[in-house]
Amino acid sequence: MLTPYGRSTILKTTIFASAIAVTGLFFPPVSRAVLILSAAAILGFAFWFFRDPERTPAETGRVILAPADGRVILVEERDHPFTGSRSTLISIFMSPLNVHVNRIPQSGRIRHLQYHPGSFKMAFDHKSMEENERMDIGIESDSLKIFFSQVSGFIARRIVCPLRMDEAVEAGKRFGMIKFGSRVDIIIPQGSTPAVTIGGKTRAGETVIARW
């Protein structure tokens, strides 16, 4: 399954790859083969990158799900104006090889939504949390508040987030993506217990990253 968030990119890539392949028809056999294979590789990568596999949460109930595929690179306590004091930050680094569709970590309503322009530092640099382009999202339910950010990286310079203020959202559902490598930082409130450690792998909408 392909994500609809990648349709325009796939269309442009298809046109570009087709042009390369057609051009190759006018070259000698060896060059022709190289160009056609290159076109196929480019198109194949585009389809593979924008894959969007179905996901089923590993647990339901009082859990917070991973908003992104990737690797946990930071778990630390910090205060935050949306989630309160002694909250916990969990940062997930998404490499270009990961599925890049993001999913809602907790059911509730969107109570905070703000886009921040910024730089494009490497996503594994923790300064990128505050200095890079990002979309901040806050969800509130009857039981808790969580806050998370889609952060652009050095390669990823396109955040997709169609969410709206006060929109009701459901845990595990798709809500956007970050194209070509990035990170997602999620802040969970005091009283929630992290279920992941640094170095652990996550799958969006499936891996439980915290319990409350």
UniProtKB/Swiss-Prot annotation:
This is Phosphatidylserine decarboxylase proenzyme. The modification Pyruvic acid (Ser) is found at residue 182. Heterodimer of a large membrane-associated beta subunit and a small pyruvoyl-containing alpha subunit. One of its GO terms (biological process) is phosphatidylethanolamine biosynthetic process. The active site is at 182 (schiff-base intermediate with substrate). Signal peptide: none annotated. Binds 1 pyruvoyl group covalently per subunit. It comes from Chlorobium luteolum (strain DSM 273 / BCRC 81028 / 2530). The keyword Isomerase does not apply. InterPro entries: PS_Dcarbxylase, PSD-A. It catalyses: a 1,2-diacyl-sn-glycero-3-phospho-L-serine + H(+) = a 1,2-diacyl-sn-glycero-3-phosphoethanolamine + CO2. Its cofactor is pyruvate.
